[in-house]
Amino acid sequence: MLTLFSVPRPFHGHYGIIQRNAIKSWTLLRPQPEIILLGTDDGTAEVAKEFGVRHVPELEYTEQGRPLADSMYKETEKVSQQPYLCIVSADIVLMGNFMSAVEQVAQRNRASLMVGQRWNLDVTEPIDFESDWEPELRQDMLARGEWGPRTGEDYILS
């Protein structure tokens, strides 16, 4: 049904922790989406292998070294087996209600666009995904988190 794709930052320090948390959360979604990590930044290939997701290194970049959005979509479309594509920031933890929302949108109309806004929560340690992590993280988010900017598009599903 769905391919999640992202261009992670290098997996160093705090960004390494939050991106690993996010990508692990994606692997736990049901139904399980196809997951593609794009680019060649440090750790991308290794993390893709660690989590059993696809790695596509080929991308076109701007002169400033930023990946081109059309290149991200083009490379994902070449290998994706799913009807819906969702670009998602590599630091966004997705919970089970995400797939419920995707399914609702898919049932209404094939030609859809879904965007989302993040909650900012400072998570400095790996999440214990063996525990009852979703309710615990949601409770922490409601207690300490803040809405991200309204202009932030942290995932775009089409």
What are these regions (language model features)?
Residues 37-85, 95-96:
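Active-site-proximal specificity loops/subdomain of glycosyltransferases
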Residues 13-15, 42-47, 122-125:
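Short, charged/polar "capping" segments at the starts of alpha-helices
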Residues 77, 93-158:
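Conserved catalytic core of nucleotide-sugar-dependent glycosyltransferases
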